[in-house]
C-alpha cells in the first residue's frame, strides 16, 4: 500500500497482525525507521482518511506456545527416563499449564481504531468492545528503564486509557533518535506524544480533555513543536 494513501485493511496478510512481535534485536530504532518508510502510519493502517486501524495478537501467544512445547517435550523425556522426583514433575506440569493458559488468553484478536472523523478511539477483543473514548486518552510515550550498571534504555510505547501497552521499539540508548521517531509516529497518527518525564517541555499535546472532564496526565508547557517537514527517517 503506498505511503500516505488510504486503503483497505490488509486482511489477507496474516503476518500484518504479528508485526509487533519483531522489534529488531540490533539497532531497533533503524528497524522502526525502515518500517515507517514502508508504512508512514505504522503500526496502523489508514483504512480511510482520518481513520487508522491496528489489528494484532499479543506476543504472549508465541511465548506461551514455546513454553508449552518445551514443557511437553521435557515431560515426555522425563517419562522415558522414569524420573520419579515429585519436584521435577510439579515444575514441568506447571510449565505446561502456564503455557497453555498464555496461548488461550492470547488467541483473541485485538483491534484498535483511531477515528479522527468522530474524535474517538475504539478498542475491541475478538469483536467485543472493551472501551472507547476521546482521542486525548491515546498517546505515544517515551519510557525509560535502566540496568544494574546504571545504563539507560528507552522504549517507545503506544498506550492509553484501558489499552494494553504496545511496545513499538525497545532497548535503545539513543534518546534523540527515539524522541524523533516517537514524535513522527504521533504526528502521523495525530495523537499526543509524551516524554519519559512526567513534566516536560518536550510533550506534544494535540488533544486536550474537554473542560471539566479532568485530565489523565498533568498539563505541561508546550515546546519543541515538531518540524513540519520530517520527511527523512534516516537514524
UniProtKB/Swiss-Prot annotation:
Membrane topology of this protein: Multi-pass membrane protein
Organism, as annotated: Homo sapiens (Human)
Self-association and partners: Component of the CatSper complex or CatSpermasome composed of the core pore-forming members CATSPER1, CATSPER2, CATSPER3 and CATSPER4 as well as auxiliary members CATSPERB, CATSPERG, CATSPERD, CATSPERE, CATSPERZ, C2CD6/CATSPERT, TMEM249, TMEM262 and EFCAB9. HSPA1 may be an additional auxiliary complex member. The core complex members CATSPER1, CATSPER2, CATSPER3 and CATSPER4 form a heterotetrameric channel.
Keywords linked to the UniProt accession: Cell membrane, Cell projection, Cilium, Flagellum, Membrane, Transmembrane, Transmembrane helix
Encoding gene per record: TMEM249
Principal location listed in the UniProt entry: membrane
InterPro entries: TMEM249
Function noted in UniProt: Auxiliary component of the CatSper complex, a complex involved in sperm cell hyperactivation.
Transmembrane residue ranges: 68-82, 94-105
Region (Disordered): 215-235
Protein name: Cation channel sperm-associated auxiliary subunit TMEM249
Polar residues bias locations: 226-235
Matches recorded under Pfam families: TMEM249
Record's subcellular location: Cell projection, Cilium, Flagellum membrane
Gene Ontology CC, one term: CatSper complex
Topological domains annotated Cytoplasmic: 1-67, 106-235
Membrane topology (Extracellular): 83-93
Amino acid at each position: 500500500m503506498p505511503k500516505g494513501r488510504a486503503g483497505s485493511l490488509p486482511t489477507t496478510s496474516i503476518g500484518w497482525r504479528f508485526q509487533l512481535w519483531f522489534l529488531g534485536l540490533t539497532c531497533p530504532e533503524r528497524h522502526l525507521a525502515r518500517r515507517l518508510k514502508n508504512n508512514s502510519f505504522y503500526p496502523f493502517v489508514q483504512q480511510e482518511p482520518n481513520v487508522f486501524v491496528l489489528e494484532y495478537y499479543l506476543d504472549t501467544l508465541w511465548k506461551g506456545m514455546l513454553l508449552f512445547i518445551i514443557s511437553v517435550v521435557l515431560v515426555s523425556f522425563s517419562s522415558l527416563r522414569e524420573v520419579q522426583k515429585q519436584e521435577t514433575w510439579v515444575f514441568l506440569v506447571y510449565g505446561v499449564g502456564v503455557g497453555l493458559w498464555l496461548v488461550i488468553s492470547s488467541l483473541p484478536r485485538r483491534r484498535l481504531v483511531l477515528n479522527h472523523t468522530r474524535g474517538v478511539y475504539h478498542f475491541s477483543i475478538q469483536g467485543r468492545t472493551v472501551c472507547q473514548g476521546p482521542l486525548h486518552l491515546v498517546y505515544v510515550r517515551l519510557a525509560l528503564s535502566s540496568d544494574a550498571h546504571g545504563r539507560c534504555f528507552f522504549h517507545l510505547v503506544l498506550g492509553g486509557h484501558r489499552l494494553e501497552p504496545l511496545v513499538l521499539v525497545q532497548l535503545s540508548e539513543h534518546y534523540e533518535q527515539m524522541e524523533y521517531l516517537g514524535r513522527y509516529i504521533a504526528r502521523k497518527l495525530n495523537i499526543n506524544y509524551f516524554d519519559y518525564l512526567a513534566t516536560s517541555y518536550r510533550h506534544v499535546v494535540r488533544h486536550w480533555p474537554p473542560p471539566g472532564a479532568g485530565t489523565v496526565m498533568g498539563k505541561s508547557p508546550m515546546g519543541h513543536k515538531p518540524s513540519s517537514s520530517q520527511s527523512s527517517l534516516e537514524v
